[in-house]
Amino acid sequence: MKLNFYIILLLLLSFVVKADQIMELIKIPNLTLYNLENKNSLAFLKPTKDFFVGSSSENVSCKKNQSQNFNKKFLDAQRSIDKYNDDFFRKIKLKYIVLCSELEIAGIPALGFANPEMKTLILNINTNNSNFERVLHHEVFHLIEHNFNKYFLNISWSDLNLKEFKYSACSTCSNNYSLEKIYNSKGFVSEYAKSTISEDMAETFSLMMSDNYLILDMISKDEILKKKVKLIENLVKKLDAKHQF
């Protein structure tokens, strides 16, 4: 009985240490540990106060959550990550998911942000329900792309598009891009997918993960998108042969 007590005490102390070291680990202040997923070792974090980190030109800011909305979005995020195999996030080096409100990147409102260096995703819980899961998968793909860049070196993604199509110079260079799903668009699942190659890949992956029935319907009518989906499948299978879309 005494041995069991010491084991429980050790686990509790370890839990507190992790919470106290959040600032040191991911360089974001005012966060507390909300939930630790044993299955995939993901830590869900929530802000106790608003936070602002970074320089004036490169910064991330987010606000403390409303508890009711936070709990719902936390459950939504859990359901989304359950679609991945247990060791998937270890492979892509994701350890922390921050859920907060009114996320901004360099002063621009954002739905999500991936920080590969800190092994962290930041998700805006103000995102509407239909887009929240897509945003999570979208940001997961950015981690895949960053940590497995070697898989992307020899692909010619832009060659799949119509010759006259040109991507924008950056993902925020236009105000015309939205996450609204579009059909028969000659290779694109949303307007935002038209911004850059990286965002196009992430948008395609996000819809494959969040609504596979819809993506199957879309590729039955869009040969360009069909090729993109096949390419994404092949890339992800290199990382995890058992991954299911």
Q: What function would you assign to each model-found segment?
A:
Residues M1-Q21:
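Classical Sec-dependent N-terminal signal peptides that target proteins to the secretory pathway
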Residues K2-L3, F89, E191-Y192:
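A general structural signal for short secondary-structure junctions and capping/turn motifs
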Residues L3, Q68-K72, T127-N131:
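Short coil/turn segments at secondary-structure boundaries
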Residues D20-F70, L99-E102, A169, C173-I182, ...:
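Non-catalytic architectural context of zinc metalloproteases
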Residues Q21-M23, S80-Y84, L153:
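An N-terminal domain-start capping segment
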Residues V53-E117:
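Auxiliary, metal-adjacent structural segments of Zn-dependent hydrolase domains
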Residues Y96-F245:
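Active-site-flanking segments in enzyme catalytic domains
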